[in-house]
A protein has these predicted regions:
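Hydrophobic residues at beta-strand termini and immediately following loops
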Residues: 6-8, 37, 100, 152
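ATPase catalytic-site recognition across NTP-hydrolyzing enzymes
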Residues: 13-71
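Acidic two-metal-ion nuclease catalytic site recognized across multiple nuclease folds
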Residues: 46, 206-219
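An active-site-proximal beta-strand-loop segment
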Residues: 69-82
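Mg2+-dependent endonuclease catalytic cores in nucleic-acid-processing enzymes, primarily RNase H-like
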Residues: 83-194
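Charged alpha-helix within mobile-element recombinases
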Residues: 187-210
């Protein structure tokens, strides 16, 4: 049978509310918006975080802190790191990346590492990846501490998990505070094809617990 194909943007559909499209443009990374709403064929290579999107500045005083943890239990030199990211969210929605740290340690040392970061930052919530053996870390911290722990079960791939933050980087809504380690930007600017992405994953988990308050609504 003969067939024909059309390539048309969502904006050409009279049944789609223009306001809905505008909101999607604000909440999605540009590559996703161009693919899904503008019907463009976009090459995803190198389309994640761009250096020109990075902003630097100080975090306002008095904002609550949130910690995200991407777990890896190993001391082997080739193993992944346990990554920790500390963020705050300003009244205007700006995300402040306040601290980044990582360790390559065994179970007991990882527990101490998380406790140390919590003691330093006094977080309102700690989001910890909770899958398979990593669930034991969450259970042990809940048993032996009074820390505000929330186990997070990854239900999406890492690029999709990071997409809300990617959109905010592109819209100049993420601020890097002073003193962050150089490896953080190395990971960020090579994500998702770099050798390591542990602290980027931790940042995505920090965003999940920071951005989950219903009072903030959808962003």
């Amino acid at each position: 049978d003969d067939w024909m194909a059309w390539q048309m943007p969502t904006t050409a559909n009279p049944w789609i509310d223009a306001e809905e499209v505008d909101k999607a443009g604000e909440s999605l990374p540009s590559i996703a918006f161009r693919q899904e709403y503008l019907a463009e064929f976009v090459d995803a290579a190198g389309a994640r975080i761009k250096r020109e999107w990075l902003r630097y500045g100080d975090c306002p005083e008095g904002l609550p802190t949130y910690i995200g943890v991407d777990l890896a239990i190993s001391t082997k030199s080739e193993a992944d790191y346990t990554g920790v990211a500390v963020v705050s969210r300003g009244d205007d929605g700006t995300i402040y990346v306040r601290d980044i740290n990582r360790t390559r340690s065994d179970f007991a040392a990882v527990l101490r590492f998380i406790e140390m970061m919590a003691e330093k930052w006094k977080p309102s919530m700690i989001g910890i990846e909770q899958v398979q053996y990593q669930a034991a870390v969450v259970q042990e911290l809940l048993r032996r501490t009074k820390l505000p722990i929330r186990g997070i079960r990854p239900d999406r791939d890492k690029v999709t998990r990071f997409a809300p933050l990617e959109a905010r980087y592109e819209q100049s809504q993420v601020m890097h505070c002073q003193g962050l380690p150089a490896y953080f930007e190395d990971e960020l600017l090579s994500f998702p094809v770099g050798r390591h992405d542990d602290v980027v994953d931790a940042l995505a988990y920090a965003w999940q617990v920071c951005g989950s308050k219903r009072s903030w609504g959808a962003v």
